[in-house]
Amino acid sequence: DNWWALELCSGPTKDMDYLLQVAHYYRAFHKQNIAVDIVKFTSDLDSYKVVVAPLAYMVKPGFAERLTKFVENGGTLIGTYMTGIADETDRCIFGAYPGPLRNVFGLWVEETDALYPEETNQIIMNENREVYSCSFLCDRLRLENAKTLGTYGSDFYAGEPCVTVNEYGKG
């Protein structure tokens, strides 16, 4: 459901390829020899230390609660752009996204910049000043409790946070 809803949404880009985007995250872990399980939104998460929820656009009943409990109990949740935007009927969730995961991530998204296919931006990590390339979508984040780990390197949002960490519960 998340896949079709995301690919059929009318914005911020028509170039959304859910499987391609998820594969980017899978490959990053695979390159580091980190085993990856692909599980359903309804799966029990208790046996995991880390959960990556790429493009968790559609938040069905119980999903946000499971992720919140997972983090409260000490788990690490990695989220991405296009998370927590729509409910189970593909209607936008009011109150800024990541919707019901806003407190877990400690931030909200003010706006999303859709980059042209050939366009990139930079991520500059705070600690070591390493620079990484980013493309496709760039969220303008407004931090509530989260702390900045990396910032955008160019465009009108240069210096704004793009990689963050938030302590929530024991996670």
Where are these regions (language model features)?
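Carbohydrate-binding surfaces of carbohydrate-active enzymes
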Residues: 1-171
